[in-house]
Amino acid sequence: MYINNINIIYYIIVGILGLIVGQFVDWCNIRLPEYKKVFSKEFFTEYMKNFKPKYLLMFGTAFLYMAILYFKGWSNELIMQLNLLKYLILTPMLLSAFAIDWKLQIIPNRLNLTMFEIGLVFMLAQGMLNINQGINLLLGSIVGAGIFLIITCIGGLIAGKEAMGFGDVKLMGALGLFFGWERIIAISLIAFLLAAIISIILLASKKKKTD
């Protein structure tokens, strides 16, 4: 049986991988904000002792992995395989960044740096296969970081404080290496729109409580 010309067995394999990776994201969400080693024998023992499956993360990651396989597809071309692999690697890191930022309003430098380093490796690998694609990804990093850096600086001048943290600047610089300059502009616009909507909702709910 095939879905979008891909054998359903591949979806099952990717889905199971997503379940495992989703639970690993929970592990990272605990370790990274504390600036501790992700892999630690002592923590592993403690984690497994109090182990609780994070079903939302597990099934959410599994769904995203299968969606990536569906939309990116499978190809015998090396550059397409690299493209699929980089999104499978990026997904759990983005989920971890979102969860930590939502809870603590920070994005750990180690997480941003890891994304940047992995993005750089894929940029160089894809650039060797297609120089134009490599340049596009490099420009994506410059544009992504540049847009958020400008907004952060302008926000600081107008409001006297950062409009957003430099963790966001680093994050967008790293994401640019994965998506390229055109997509990172679209992602930036979507991010601003979502941030504006969330801010309006929070302000409205706060005002309602004070009335």
Stretches with model-predicted labels:
Residues 1-211:
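A membrane-topology feature that recognizes alpha-helical transmembrane segments
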